[in-house]
Design a protein with these regions (language model features):
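P-loop NTPase motor domains
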Residues: 1-205, 220, 230, 279-283, ...
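Conserved ATP-driven motor cores of ASCE-family P-loop NTPases powering translocation/secretion/packaging/pilus
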Residues: 197-299
């Protein structure tokens, strides 16, 4: 149960951990005790809604308390029971605050359509590496209200595929899974992505991170942004004006050696001439040169080789371009 959202302050750490403890207890109960048809997010929400804590009555028991009491009688060493007893160490006022925090964080799931989305597994994410599959995740580029759902999806996808690669296929999926993460900055933070990007490749999984600028990545992943970039074997720059990106691309390109000749002439009683020769280092492309790069050009950096300055691919020359709606409006896919 990962409950830590963006912008959590160190002073709020107690409440985040308390929420996580409570979620862990409830999810443990659902996982081990609930029937298969109730092992879903909706059951978790219903259990939270059935929870209640009273400041003036420490002995009050809500329906969830009674459920765990019966479970403890049956199995005192049950994982969920141990987690719940830790949560119950909180006094009535503290427990009430924890429940309010849970309710506030999960408020979006009060929307009926979102609950229904979480009730059943219709996507079978764990089968994507078994056969050729195309999964389109379409999100709004102006409203980020539900971007956290996409973040949950990607987290689940990577975890399921890595587990299946290890447990079923001996470490590598039979069909390569390529994740084209367009507008990566808009899907929210994927927990531990800086570690995933380094380990998924061995499972036959790759990720293409598409950003408007490097600063977008740093805004979301902070110090881990450099780790993420460092684990990408290929960098493709299509153009841009953001200063941080221009600086990093210029540094990646390195320097070239130029020959410098300086001549001097001194006039006096006698005329003398001087010639000075030296080798100097100059950026292969300066930041201002990259900023005004022709729109039809791109820079490609592959690990282990020098960068390429190349023409962008003309998509109209692709053999399957005729199937796109750009080529023929009749091909437009209406959802």
């Amino acid at each position: 149960a990962n409950t830590k959202g963006d912008g959590e302050k160190s002073g709020e750490d107690f409440w985040v951990k308390a929420e996580k403890l409570y979620y862990t207890a409830l999810i443990g109960y659902i996982w081990y005790e609930a029937p298969d048809e109730e092992k879903n997010f909706t059951t978790l929400l219903e259990m939270i809604n059935a929870s209640e804590a009273r400041e003036d009555d420490e002995d009050f028991q809500n329906p969830v308390d009674l459920m765990f009491e019966r479970l403890e009688e049956k199995d005192p060493e049950h994982f969920a029971v141990k987690q719940y007893k830790k949560y119950k160490l909180a006094a009535g006022k503290t427990a009430k605050s924890i429940l309010i925090s849970c309710g506030a964080r999960l408020a979006p799931f009060d929307i009926k359509e979102l609950r229904e989305l979480m009730e059943t597994d219709e996507m079978e994410l764990d089968t994507i590496g078994d056969r050729k599959t195309a999964l389109f995740v379409i999100i709004s580029d102006t409203d980020d209200t539900f971007n956290f759902v996409v973040s949950i999806l990607y987290t689940q996808l990577f975890n399921l595929l890595c587990d299946k690669a290890d447990d079923v296929y001996g470490g590598r999926l039979p069909v390569h899974v390529r994740c084209l993460l367009d507008e990566f900055a808009n899907i929210g933070q994927i927990p531990k992505f800086e570690k995933l990007i380094a380990t998924i490749r061995s499972r036959e999984i790759s990720a293409s991170i598409i950003l408007q600028s490097q600063s977008q990545l740093k805004a979301i992943y902070k110090d881990n942004a450099d780790t993420i970039v460092g684990n990408c074997d290929t960098t493709l720059f299509l153009g841009g004006k953001e200063k941080t990106t221009l600086k990093e691309i210029s540094e990646i390109l390195g320097k070239e050696t130029i020959d410098s000749f300086n001549t001097s002439e001194t006039r006096g009683r006698e005329l003398s001439h001087g010639l000075n020769y030296q080798k100097l280092g100059k950026e292969l492309m300066t930041q201002d040169e990259i900023a005004v790069m022709d729109g039809g050009k791109c820079i490609l950096q592959l690990r282990g080789v020098r960068p390429f300055f190349s023409d962008k691919f003309d998509i109209t020359k692709h053999p399957k371009y005729k199937y796109l709606s750009d080529a023929d409006p009749k091909n437009a896919f209406d959802m």
